[in-house]
C-alpha cells in the first residue's frame, strides 16, 4: 500500500491518526480476497479523484449504492435506508459540514453511528482507498458523489478495519444507522406434510403482499444464502435491495406481483422470465412493460413473486421511523411512542444461568415491565459484541478479557455473539415467588435461542406487571446486553437487583500487614457521572491517584468500590472501575488524556452490586483509579478503598 499522488493542498488537511491511511485500517488478518491488492491500494482525497466532488447528488438516482471489492453488501443495503428518509440521513450525516469547495474545508468528515443505546459521533479524514485512481470499495452511481464511501470509511473505523466489514447482517447495520429495530423473515421452511407446505405457502404470499404496504416507508432487503440450480448468477451469501413492488393485472385479469431488485454489484444478474426481453412480459400490456423496464437502473431487474419466493432465502426489513423519532409497527402501523432501555450483563458464576433447561435459569438478569394500558409492545435484547466495542473516539477496541480471542471475517456469522433468548411472564404483583413463577409457562418467548446480535418479541399486552428474563443458551456464558422496550402505550421498566442484606460479604484480605486508604466521592449528573468507557463523557468521572512504593517486586493491591445505599434499598447501580498507569515522567499528566488510553486493569462488566473488588499485583509506580456507573448521568455516592500489602524487610541485630 502506498500513498496516492495528487495536488498538494495549500493548507495542512486533517489526518486521522486513529484510523490512518495504512494497512492497519484496511486489514485485520489478511484472510479475505482483499489481501491480493495490498501493494496496489493507494489513498486519495475526493478532490484528487475527480475535479468537482460532491457529498450528495441533485438527482437521488445518482447517489444509488454500488459495491466494490469489499464484501460489505449487508452494510450497503442498509445505507439505502438513508435515501428513503431525509430525517435519517441528517441524523447519520450531520448537515452543514464544510465540503471541498468551501473555504472552511479541513479534510475531515463526521458521522453518527448508533452503538448500544447511544449515538456516537465519529470523525475521520476523507482519504479513501483507491485502485488505479478510482475508488476500490463502495461508490455511488455517479462517482463524483461521496456520501457513501465516506460513511463506509466511518463504519470501518468503528469496526477496526475495512476487512472487518467482510460479511455481516443487514439487520445489524440497519440498527446501527437508525437506532431502531429490524426483522428477518425466512422465506424457507422445513419440508413437512402437504398441509404444512400449504400453510407455509399462504404465509409467504401474505409476506409479499405486506411488503406492498411497507415499500415506501421501510428499507427492504433480500438475501441469497445458497443459490438454486439455474440461478447461480445471484451469488452466494449476497444481499440485495428490494427497490420497488408493483401489483399488475395480466391479460386474463389475474393479479401479478413484481418485485424490483437492485444488486449492489451494479450489474444485472437475473435470467428469469421477467428479465429484459423475457417471456414474462408477454402477459401484460406493452405500455406497462415499457414503463417498468424504463425504470430500471444499473444493476436492477424485475422478479415475479413465485420466482422471488423460490430463489431468495430471507427478507430483512427495517421498522419505519417518523421524523419525531418514533418507530412504527410493521404489523399494525401504530406508532411505538413509548420507549425504555436498561443495560444488563450475564456474569459467569453469578447471573449467567443459561436457558430454561438449566437449574440456574432463575439467576439470570430479571426486569419488571409495567404496562399501564392495553398496548402493542416490542421487547428486544441487544448483545454487545464479545470481540469489539467502540471507545470515546469511535474507534474499535478489544473488549476487556477478550484481547487474545482470534477472529476472521470469514468466520461463521454470529460466532462472536452468544445464543440468546427472551421470555416473559405476567404476574399479579411485584412481590412474587420468583422460582414458582419461572416454573410456569411464559406468556411469550422467543422460539429458540439465536446467535443473533438482537432478538425481540412482539406482544399484545394487557395492563399489569410482567417479568422479563433474557438468557444465554449455555450456563456461565458471559456477555453484556441492552434491554429495549417499544410500546404504543405507557410502560415502565426496572431491573430486579440483588437485595443489600444478601450481598456477599467483602472478601478478607490475604494474611499479612496491609496499609489501607479510603477515598470518598460521588457521581453527579452533568458533572462527574460520565458513565462507562463506551461514552465520550467517560473522562469526566472522578479520578483518584495512588502509588505503589518501591520494593523488591510488584505489590499485592486490593481495590474495592462500594456504592452507598440505604439498608432497604434494593436498586443498585451497575458499577465498575478501571486502573490506569501514569507513564514515567508523566507525574503531572492530566487525567483526561490519560483516560483516553487503554487501562492497565479493569473490574468490568459493570455489576448490579453494592460492592465490587479486584485483587491485583502492581509494580511500583503511580496510578489512577476511575470508578464509574454504566450509564452517564447516573447519580450516587461511593467509597474507594485501596489496600496495599506492606512487605517488611527483615531486621538484623
UniProtKB/Swiss-Prot annotation:
It comes from the Eukaryota. InterPro entries: C2_III, Calpain_cysteine_protease, Calpain_domain_III, Calpain_III, Calpain_III_sf, Papain-like_cys_pep_sf, Pept_cys_AS, Peptidase_C2_calpain_cat. GO terms for biological process: proteolysis. Disulfide bonds: none annotated. GO terms for cellular component: cytoplasm. Its EC number is 3.4.22.-. CDD domains: Calpain_III, CysPc. The keyword Protease applies. Residues 13-321 form the Calpain catalytic domain. Residues 513-653 are annotated as: Domain III 2. Calcium-regulated non-lysosomal thiol-protease which catalyzes limited proteolysis of substrates involved in cytoskeletal remodeling and signal transduction. May play a role in insulin-stimulated glucose uptake. This is Calpain-10. The lineage of its organism: Eukaryota, Metazoa, Chordata, Craniata, Vertebrata.
